[in-house]
A protein has these predicted regions:
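Non-catalytic protein-protein interaction scaffold segments in large eukaryotic complex-forming proteins
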Residues: 2-58
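Extracellular/periplasmic catalytic domains that process cell-envelope and extracellular macromolecules
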Residues: 125-127, 172-177
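Long, charge-dense tracts
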Residues: 48-93
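An exposed tryptophan-centered "aromatic clamp" motif
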Residues: 75-79, 84-101, 215-240
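A Trp-anchored, charged/polar loop motif used as the substrate-binding/catalytic surface
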Residues: 152-170
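Conserved hydrophobic ligand-interaction patch in extracellular adhesion modules
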Residues: 180-240
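Extended acidic/polar, glycine-enriched regions
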Residues: 120-156
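Residues that flank catalytic or metal-binding motifs in active/ligand-binding sites
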Residues: 19, 84, 130, 158, ...
Length: 240
């Protein structure tokens, strides 16, 4: 992933005569967006232009010179669920010097906090580093997991374009930003293993629907099971 660079002139005189030395300072840039890296290598790995098994997704909306908001729809994630999170891997700036405002759109909130990342799936060389962690919150049905006929829950308005801005904690100046477009929202049923018909009825009662194969990324087309973990789905058209 290429990054932009700042060139500053150093006006110090040297013995050979008057000369300005160029000091190349990397500008703050988001290099990768890291979800859970389990099942992200070998036969599960994505295209090299999109995915690094040790770092996560490459940012698609940035080139050598600038950020392109019109390409936010190519960035990760495009789907979300309550309490899911991912990390922004940023270079060229002290993460602890950044502050982020939460963004709420269509009933979904993206909140960024600076955390020390020690998740078990993070490579050893990256553990303990401070990262900007993005958590999504929105409609969920935790208090109705055990109810076979739950009450309807809120439906987010999709799609929504989120732009997260990291600002200097002292000056409030914009330092770095990241954008993505959420097109789908999932609601899960925890550890409840039920038949397809039971899960279908549960989802429909919520006002959602069961996802189809084409709604899921990387899903095999030939799974066979008598009982399923509940996961309901709403797409950008609100379709059921």
């Amino acid at each position: 992933m290429s990054s932009s660079w700042n060139v500053q002139a150093n006006g110090k005189k040297v013995r050979a005569g008057n000369r300005s030395d160029a000091i190349i300072i990397p500008s703050p840039v988001i290099n990768y967006v890291r979800p859970n890296l389990n099942f992200g290598d070998d036969e599960y790995a994505g295209q090299a232009s999109l995915w690094n098994p040790d770092k996560g997704f490459l940012v698609q909306s940035i080139d050598f010179e600038s950020i392109h908001p019109e390409l936010y729809n190519l960035n990760f994630p495009t789907t979300g669920m309550h309490n899911l999170y991912f990390d922004l891997l940023i270079t060229g700036v002290n993460i602890n010097k950044l502050t982020w405002e939460p963004v709420t759109l269509g009933g979904i909130t993206a909140t960024v906090t600076n955390v020390v990342a020690n998740d078990r799936w993070i490579p050893d060389e990256d553990k303990g580093q401070v990262v900007a962690r993005v958590k999504l919150t929105g409609p969920e049905a935790r208090n109705q997991w055990y109810n076979p006929h739950p009450n309807p829950i809120a439906k987010p308005r999709l799609p929504q374009t989120f732009e997260l801005v990291g600002r200097d904690i002292s000056t409030a100046d914009e330092v770095v930003k990241y954008g993505f477009v959420l097109k789908q929202w999932f609601v899960n049923r925890g550890d409840q293993l039920k038949t397809y018909s039971d899960q279908l009825a549960w989802c429909n009662s919520l006002g959602y629907r069961m996802p189809r194969i084409r709604d899921l990324t990387g899903m095999a087309t030939h799974f066979q099971t008598k009982k399923l973990r509940g996961k309901c789905f709403l797409n950008s058209t609100g379709g059921k």
